[in-house]
Each structure stands twice: as structure tokens, then as C-alpha cells.
Amino acid sequence: MRLITAYNPPASPARTRPADRAPLRVAAVQQSWHRDPAEHRAALMEGIRLAAGEGARVVCLQELTLSPYFAVLRKADHPAPAEPEDLATGPTFAFAAAAARAHGVYVHASLYEKAPAPDGGDDGLGYNTAILVAPDGTLAQRTRKTHIPLTEGYYEDQWFRQGPADDAFPLVKVDEANLGLPTCWDQWFPELARAYSLAGADILVYPTAIGSEPGHPGFDTQPLWQKVITGNAVANATFMVVPNRVGAENGLVFYGSSFIVDPYGRVLAQAPRDEPAVLVADLDLDARRDWLELFPFLTTRRPDAYAPLTATG
């Protein structure tokens, strides 16, 4: 598995005083899905082992970590529909907890969570949920995906309901850093990144499953995907850690290109499009402070002028 590192973070060009916080070393594991569950877990565990061996404090895994990307098909058309799992007792948490304990790191993962609808009923849907497991194997935080795609090849509305609006932007503290745990399609919405930044997020982790467009086979969205995430990093003074998957599943070709970007829009580390990789980078956490002091986006906002953002329809 290819290892790509970015240590000794670049200087913060807006810095006027020494940093108050130590850098945080994070990792993103880019992997393909393996049909054999044991082989798949072993491949992911090897990525976690490599990252931990490089001193990563947090290791981030792709969307629907242990699963194929089953939303490439509508549920009614799927030959073997995936079943949601219990967050606390299911295989994803068990895997992440075992990896966290074995390697003494925080492990971030993603799962199809079994949970009742907000009204207590059964709507046939679950949540697309990101979790962070602490080194002692306990759940540090969980976040349900807020925005759900519904386009060809990404029929997530057939499988997942939207995450609750009143619990959309929780943070978790890792050492001196505040992390947010949104998921994939959330990365296209500037409102979400802004809400997390206002809450004090230093780092957003976006587990991702994105690749080709079945209805537009000649359209490569990878450059746009990276640009929008990078733009949101700059506009909100947050680091972005983005683990995507690679490989082909049911005609969908995932384009990898996992990356880690800083609040100045500088890509610290990037994976190739077509092979597994582990990215490990040091994040200068106070680059956020420096950039917001020079360009105070958060304190010069005009919420009184933003009514169209909350209009429906």
C-alpha cells in the first residue's frame, strides 16, 4: 500500500505570533472494496497499522467502510439489499474499536446505521453515519449525514434518511483540535462547512464514495469535487481530510484522489486515482486562527441578509 506523508507543515503566511497549539498528525486511508470480508478488513487494518506506525493520532476511513457502495442501485433493483447495522453492536463499530485499541489511535469509520424514523416508525431507511472511536475502544462521537444524494448511480435516498437538523453539527475534541464528522455529499454544501466553522471546528473529515457519473460517462467530476472542498476550507478556515474509495463496483468507477487540505487551500497530501494509499500529514492547528485574524469571515457575516438560505422550495 502506497504511503504518502507530509510532515513539518508549511508556514502559516498570516501568522503574527507563535502558535498556541501543537500540530496534530492525521491520516486518511484510501482503499477498494474486497468481496471477501476478511480480506477487506485486513486491507483496512493494514492501512491503519501503517498510519499508526507513522505517528498518526487520528486515522480516517472511507464512506460505508466495511460495505460495497450498494446505493449504486435502487433498493428495489438490488439483488442482495444491504441491511443496516446497530451502531453500538454492529460490525463497523466492532472493527473500528478493535483497530483503535490495537494501535492506540482514534479511528474514524462510516456505516449504514439501523435506527427508527424520527416518529418512531419504520420507513425502510437508516442513517449514513460517521463515527469516531477513541483509543480505548469507546465511541467518541457520531454524526448522521445531513444531505442525501438522489442522482443516477448514487440512489442514497432509497437507503438513507436525512440526518436530524437539530443534531447536524456535533464536534469532538481530540487533544487540542475540534473535529466535525460530516459525510460525502455534505461536502458540496457551503452552509454546512460554515455552520461547523461557526461551531469552532478546526478539521472536517468527509468519508467519501464518489466516482464516475453513469448518466454522463465522459464527465470527470474529480476536479470540481476537489475545488469545492478546497474552497470551503479557505472560506471557513478549516482543514479538510477526505478519504475516498477506489476501484469499480457495479459499473461505478471510484476516482480515489483522497486528499488533506489546509485553511489556505494548500493540498498537503493527495492519493492517486487508482490505487490504495495512506496519507499522513501534520496539521498546524493555529493556521485557522491566523487566517481568520487576517480575513475575519465569521465576524463580518450578515445573517440578517441571508433569509433566502432558509427558504424552502
Identify the meaning behind each predicted range.
Residues 2-14, 231, 239-313:
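C-terminal beta-strand edge segments of enzyme domains
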Residues 3-10, 85-87, 115-203, 207-228, ...:
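Active-site catalytic loop in hydrolytic enzyme cores
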Residues 11-16, 42-59, 191-198:
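Short amphipathic alpha-helices and their capping/turn segments at secondary-structure boundaries
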Residues 19-32:
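Short beta-strand segments enriched in small/hydrophobic residues
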Residues 26, 132-141, 261-269:
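Short, glycine-anchored, charge-dense loop/turn motifs used at functional sites
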Residues 37, 45-135, 142, 210-231, ...:
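Cys-nucleophile CN-hydrolase/nitrilase-fold catalytic domain and related Cys-dependent amidase chemistry
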Residues 85-108, 178, 184-277:
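CN hydrolase (nitrilase-like) catalytic-core segments centered on the catalytic cysteine
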Residues 109-111, 128-132, 170, 258-260, ...:
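Short beta-strand scaffold segments in enzyme catalytic cores
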